[in-house]
Curated annotation (Swiss-Prot):
Protein name, UniProt field: Abnormal pharyngeal pumping eat-20
Residue ranges, Cytoplasmic side: 770-810
Compositionally biased region (Acidic residues): 542-558
Signal peptide interval: 1-20
Keyword tRNA-binding: no
One GO cellular component term: axon
Residue ranges occupied by any EGF-like domain in the UniProt entry: 220-257, 258-293, 301-335
Topology in the lipid bilayer: Single-pass type I membrane protein
Keyword GTP-binding among record annotations: no
Functional summary from the UniProt entry: Regulates pharyngeal pumping during feeding.
Disulfide bonds: C224-C235, C229-C245, C247-C256, C261-C272, C266-C281, C283-C292, C305-C314, C309-C323, C325-C334
Tissue distribution of the protein: Highly expressed in the pharynx, circumpharyngeal cells, pharyngeal-intestinal valve and a subset of neurons in larval and embryonic stages. Also moderately expressed in the lining of the intestine, coelomocytes, labial process bundles and some hypodermal cells. In adults, it is predominantly expressed in the pharynx, the pharyngeal-intenstinal valve, some circumpharyngeal cells, m3, m4 and m6 pharyngeal muscles, and IL1, OLQ, BAG and ALN neurons.
Superkingdom of the organism of origin: Eukaryota
Length: 810
């Protein structure tokens, strides 16, 4: 019995809570008394539109406005359903029934006890869109049983699936539910459901006497109570709480007190109209003009429109010639596209947004077809009126945080901006003094003496980098066809050079790509000047040159003949040396190894020292063995003979030297000024039988002998005053390429060992798994304890066949 009572108790509690919840979910009220509303937006295609609900009158004592219909395009209130006063002076607290029916011509309001009101709308030729509103300012205190087009609102907050609406501050429950005096017994039971709930220790209900004695909350007076709007204007409360007047068409002012047509005297029966605060006269068909002061001429004459109609026809309209535009066009001469056709221009703001052309588009005249300007209007979520969508979706001005002003300073680029410049065609001239600068893979590279070992093939050189500095460019003369490929950096030119003491020694560099012999001369300059760098674009080698190179290729080496020139000053005079540089590359060298060597050279170039002075050291007694290409010896001899004849007239010795360079070549102009604090260069005149040798990264390249051309008139050696020109013998050469090969071999060995160890581990794991499987099968598959016991007993038992029949019977 006790268990049955407990079950009944729990069931009663559940029923009471469910009933209370259903009552609360079926009753609604506006939590914001000043801005709460529910808005539907309709067009004429949705009419007739019906609905209804039960309501409690407004607690303010003013007439309760149950429904308002506003023209969305103009904001004019077309009609309202106001609850009639009762005997209690609108203070009756009981549920009342209200229903409505909206048509294109008017609004029908029906109240209980048969009371009905009909509100007629002003006729218009233009299609209308309606904004139907239930507002909390003077609206009902609570609502329930809301039905629209036979669909009842459900949920909390309420919603309709087929007749959706936008609501603001509309929530479930009603704080005045206990004070409502219902007439019917069913309504009394619904209202007193919470009051008559059984009282249990854990669920104590609310005492009805407490709710009945509580004073209803008082609302502050509306700002529109003391704000009167004239000429049938509508008072609205803004978001800031200020009262504003929404004026009818034709009136303006803070309180709609100004009539825009009062100062426009239309003549000859014309009627003053206004559009957005602008008054104009609507003239009868027989008159025209600003004030309808002019009579029309004979309309039988074909109308002539000025300017001519582009996308329409000229017709008489209201007594004057006007352009009647086709669909999709507007303007005075129908040359303005109606971009609002179909409202696709404002579709990004939602389905309720509409596109409206500017007012002056119908009067705009254009000789060419242009797009019309428009505005996107969206219904305001509070009062439902159409406002600018950009202002509606833009953030409030008060929510914008101040940001710091970004100051952009002029930033000097860290790279040279190159441009193609025209080269002068004047005669080449020599310069006073120069130093040697080489360009490898960085924008600018300088050559300076150091005890660090450079990368192959720059033996005895240290390549350094320095900050970029603007420099001036001198004139340059190059033989065709390479002069059109010179890229100069304009003024100023950005170059990389360490700061050094002022001197009259400008530095000049020419960068020549493979197979491009080049000679560059510069005009003499004085004063402090930084090195200027020239870049020569690579030229495509001829097929004949490639064939000649293939003919001179042997089994063990490959030669690339690349002539270059060098100028050296001797006792204040200039000596020009013409060197035919031949680079030998072993036949076993691959492209990948060449790339590795280039990368090693680039890395050492980056890490080298940055001394400002630049000097090339040449060993006087060194020997160099190489093999000159047989196909180019005659050309070399002719070139050398021509240069010797020119040099003999100037008493300058010409010597042919050779050095080891990479597949590109460098034309270097070197001059040494006597009494200069920088180290000088000694360029001896080697004898025909002498040999020169150079070391590149500790590897000596052995090459075949080559004939050397010397001038018999000059047998003296060049002696400098301030420095010895011998190559430093304490330079330590590094085997960069061999080091990389050894590291690669070590990597392969480690990888092979790792693979072997991994294979052994896999083999051991496989053996372990196989052994486990065999043991598992033996234990779980073939092994049977009963069978084993039987076999064991049979083995030790005496066979019955050896026992006599009599003994077996016993």
């Amino acid at each position: 019995m006790t268990t049955f009572c407990r079950v009944l108790l729990i069931f009663g509690i559940y029923v009471a809570v469910c009933c209370a919840q259903s009552v609360e979910d079926d009753v609604f009220h506006f939590t914001n008394p000043s801005q709460g509303n529910a808005v539907w937006i309709l067009d004429e295609s949705s009419l007739p539109w019906t609905g209804g609900y039960q309501f409690l009158r407004s607690i303010s004592g003013m007439p309760t406005t149950l429904l308002s219909v506003v023209d969305s395009s103009t904001g004019v209130t077309l009609g309202q359903c106001v609850a009639p006063q009762d005997a209690t002076g609108n203070f009756s607290k009981r549920w009342e029934r209200f229903s409505w029916e909206l048509t294109a011509s008017g609004l029908d309001c029906t109240f209980e006890h048969g009371a009905a009101i009909r509100v007629e709308f002003d006729r218009t030729q233009n299609p209308r869109t309606f904004s139907i509103r239930i507002q909390s300012i003077t609206g009902p205190a609570c609502l329930r049983d809301v039905v629209v087009q036979t669909e009842q609102a459900t949920g909390c907050p309420p919603h309709l699936s087929r007749n959706s609406f936008t609501a603001n501050a509309l929530n479930c429950s009603c704080p005045f539910l206990d004070a409502a005096n219902e007439d019917s017994e069913i309504e009394n039971e619904d209202v007193d459901m919470l009051a008559n709930t059984p009282q249990f220790p854990l669920f104590k209900g609310i005492d009805p006497s407490v709710l009945g004695s509580a004073n209803p909350p008082t609302l502050p007076p509306s700002p529109c109570a003391n704000h009167e709007c004239h000429n049938n204007g509508t008072c609205l409360v803004s978001q800031e709480g200020a009262a504003t007047c929404l004026c009818r068409n034709g009136f303006t002012g803070d309180r709609c007190e100004l009539d825009v047509c009062s100062s426009v005297p239309c003549q000859n029966g014309g009627v003053c109209r206004s559009n957005n605060g602008i008054a104009y006269c609507e003239c009868p068909p027989a008159f025209t003009g600003l004030l309808c002061e002019s009579a029309h001429t004979d309309e039988s004459v074909a109308p002539i429109c000025r300017p001519e109609c582009s996308n329409g026809q000229c017709v008489f309209k209201d007594g004057q010639a006007q352009c009647e535009c086709r669909q999709g066009f507007t303007g005075a001469n129908c040359n303005v596209l109606d971009v609002c056709l179909g409202d696709a221009a404002c579709s990004m703001f939602g389905p309720l947004a509409k596109c409206v052309l500017d007012d002056n588009m119908d009067k705009m005249s254009s000789l060419t077809l242009i797009n019309g300007t428009y505005d996107c209007l969206c219904p305001h979520p509070i009062h439902g009126q159409f406002v600018d969508c950009m202002q509606l979706h833009a953030p409030s001005a008060t929510s914008v945080q101040p940001t710091e002003q970004v100051v952009i300073n002029n930033v000097t680029p860290s790279f040279p901006v190159l441009e193609i410049s025209k080269l002068p065609t004047g005669a080449p001239v020599t310069f006073t003094a120069t130093s040697t600068t080489l360009m490898v893979t960085q924008p600018t590279v300088t050559v300076s003496p150091t005890h660090q070992v450079p990368s192959e093939p720059f033996v005895g050189f240290t390549v350094t980098r320095a900050p970029l500095r603007p420099l001036d460019i001198g004139s340059t003369t190059l033989p065709p066809p390479f002069n059109q490929h010179i890229i100069t950096a304009g003024e100023p030119t950005w170059s990389s050079q360490q700061p050094h003491q002022p001197s009259e020694v400008p530095t000049q560099t020419t960068f020549i790509f493979p197979q491009t012999p080049e000679t560059t001369t510069f005009a003499p300059t004085t004063g402090t000047q930084q090195p200027v760098h020239k870049f020569v674009s690579p030229s495509v080698p001829d097929e004949n040159e490639e064939e000649e190179e293939e003919e001179t290729t042997e089994e063990t080496e490959e030669t690339f003949p690349t002539p270059s020139t060098m100028q050296v000053a001797t006792n204040g005079q200039f000596t020009t040396e013409t060197a035919f540089v031949t680079s030998t590359i072993p036949s076993t060298t691959t492209d990948m190894e060449e790339t590795d060597e280039d990368e090693d050279m680039t890395e050492e170039v980056t890490d080298s020292s940055t001394q400002p002075s630049t000097t090339v050291f040449v060993q006087p007694t060194t020997t160099f063995t190489t093999e000159a290409p047989t196909t180019t010896m005659e050309e070399e001899e002719e070139m050398t003979t021509d240069q010797v004849e020119d040099i003999e007239s100037e008493e300058i010795a010409t010597t042919t030297t050779q050095t080891s360079l990479p597949f590109w070549m460098t034309t270097t102009n070197k001059q040494v000024v006597p009494d200069s604090p920088t180290p000088m260069v000694i360029m001896p005149h080697p004898q025909p039988d002498e040999k020169m040798e150079t070391s590149t990264e500790g590897v000596v390249d052995e090459e075949s002998d080559e004939e050397r051309t010397t001038v018999p008139e000059s047998n003296e050696e060049v002696v400098t005053k301030n420095a010895e020109a011998t190559t430093p013998s304490d330079i330590t050469h590094h085997h960069t390429s061999s080091g990389k090969q050894s590291s690669a071999a070590a990597s392969w060995i480690i990888a092979i060992i790792a693979l072997i160890v991994l294979g052994l581990l896999l083999l051991a794991t496989s053996l372990f798994i196989l052994r486990y499987i065999r043991q598992s099968r033996k234990l779980h598959g073939k092994y049977n304890p009963a069978r084993e016991e039987h076999n064991l007993s049979a083995a030790y038992a005496m066979p019955m066949s050896h026992i006599a029949k009599e003994e077996r019977l016993i």
